[in-house]
Regions:
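Short coil/turn motifs that cap or connect alpha-helices
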Residues: 25, 113, 123-124
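Membrane-embedded helix boundary and interhelical linker motif in transport proteins
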Residues: 1-28, 77, 179
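Structural signature of hydrophobic alpha-helical transmembrane segments
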Residues: 7-18, 84, 157-165
Length: 184
């Protein structure tokens, strides 16, 4: 969209909506179809990469507008990278959601004991789908920051990052059994 002359803000919004929608697809596969989360997300990742190859013909997308690049990969006051500010803002929003909202409590409850959460009257499937949708938005944001940083839309960008993310979460102390953890 950016290369075809679409307004960068509209392209950004479409990217976020697409990330949300593809996250919902993952959520449906896990919550409704009852696929194992690792299998569902690994499978859809392969499908989404295949679609990226088809759309781009396997070639990088060049000529990313400079204003888009500066917005997501520029510096604020010439010192602080805007991507760091974006990460900080998103981190605060997620922290507030997890700590101070009913949805955040439901996410912890789902990770701790899904059956007890369901018996407590929580709509487990909906909350799972929303969690995956939020992850999809996060992936879309990360993809746009990477696009701005590289200055090109590489259909192979990010390959191998998924294992780095799992390792970073585990090394950072996140319980792989769920139900525990904080933003810090």
């Amino acid at each position: 969209l950016l290369v075809s002359g679409v307004n960068p803000f509209l392209a950004f919004a479409v990217g976020i909506i697409l990330g949300f929608s593809l996250g919902i697809v993952n959520g449906i596969l896990v919550a409704k179809v009852k696929l194992q989360p690792f299998i569902a997300t690994l499978g859809t990742m392969s499908i989404y990469r295949g679609v990226a190859y088809i759309i781009t013909g396997g070639w990088p997308v060049l000529d990313i507008p400079e204003n888009f690049r500066k917005a997501l990969d520029g510096d604020i006051f010439g010192v602080i990278p805007s991507s760091v500010v974006l990460l900080f803002v998103v981190g605060i929003i997620i922290w507030i959601i997890l700590k101070y909202t009913r949805f955040g409590n439901y996410i912890y409850a789902l990770g701790s004991n899904e059956e007890a959460t369901k018996l407590s009257g929580v709509n487990v499937d909906f909350n799972k789908m929303m969690a995956y949708a939020i992850c999809g938005v996060g992936a879309a944001l990360a993809g746009m920051v990477l696009l701005a940083r590289l200055g090109t839309g590489e259909p192979t960008a990010g390959q191998g990052y998924e294992l780095n993310a799992i390792a970073a979460a585990a090394v950072g102390g996140t319980s792989l059994m769920g139900g525990k953890g904080t933003m810090l």
